């Protein structure tokens, strides 16, 4: 199946002034309403990572769950959930981080990973990189390492991919948008 970049991008809906004035939110729900586009997303990630040397897939709450869980299933890898504060029932590790909207906390079960594990992190998009950097910090606190950060969308003007790369975390995104791109 050929990856059609322009058709793919047309299925990501821009929502102006959401969740606050001046922000163009990239809504991926139309992408998931297209079985063909969803298959292209999953197949692209599976092909990238099928021969990669890693042990776990970490998924960011909540839209990272949509992609990473299917990729984990396809690659037969354990899934690690990184959740918003207060959503996990057992002992957790917590990490504060800044988003483009304010401060938040990311949590993971404390027994999710151990030394020697290697994780590919999945989210829907990379904006400031705050969520993925918080997840990387949690991964490292458990003695594991980050293999790569993956997302459907990169917003390079917000600098998240650069911040991740500066921390020696490679990134891979299927597409990117300029902030003013409609």
From Swiss-Prot:
Cross-referenced PROSITE patterns: PUR_PYR_PR_TRANSFER
Cellular-component GO terms for this entry: cytosol
Primary site of residence: cytoplasm
Listed GO MF terms: adenine phosphoribosyltransferase activity
Gene Ontology biological process terms from the UniProt entry: adenine salvage; AMP salvage; purine ribonucleoside salvage
Catalytic activity: AMP + diphosphate = 5-phospho-alpha-D-ribose 1-diphosphate + adenine
Subcellular location: Cytoplasm
Keyword Ubl conjugation included in the entry's annotation: no
E.C. number(s) listed in UniProt: 2.4.2.7
Family designation: Belongs to the purine/pyrimidine phosphoribosyltransferase family.
Quaternary structure, from the entry: Homodimer.
Name listed for the protein in its UniProt record: Adenine phosphoribosyltransferase
Lineage: Bacteria, Pseudomonadati, Pseudomonadota, Gammaproteobacteria, Pseudomonadales
């Amino acid at each position: 199946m050929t990856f059609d970049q322009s058709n793919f991008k047309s299925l990501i809906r821009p929502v102006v002034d959401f969740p606050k004035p001046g922000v163009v939110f990239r809504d991926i729900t139309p992408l998931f309403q297209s079985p063909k586009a969803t298959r292209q997303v999953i197949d692209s990630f599976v092909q990238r990572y099928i021969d990669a040397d890693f042990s776990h897939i970490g998924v960011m709450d909540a839209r990272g769950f949509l992609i990473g869980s299917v990729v984990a299933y396809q690659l037969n890898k354990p899934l690690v959930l990184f959740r918003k504060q207060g959503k996990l029932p057992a002992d957790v590790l917590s990490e504060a981080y800044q988003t483009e909207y304010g401060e938040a906390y990311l949590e993971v079960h404390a027994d999710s990973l151990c030394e020697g594990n290697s994780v590919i992190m999945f989210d829907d998009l990379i904006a400031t990189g705050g969520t993925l950097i918080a997840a990387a910090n949690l991964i490292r606190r458990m003695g594991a390492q980050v293999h790569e950060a993956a997302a459907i969308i990169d917003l390079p003007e917000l600098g998240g991919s650069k911040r991740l790369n500066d921390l020696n975390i490679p990134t891979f995104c299927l597409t990117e948008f300029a902030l003013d791109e409609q």
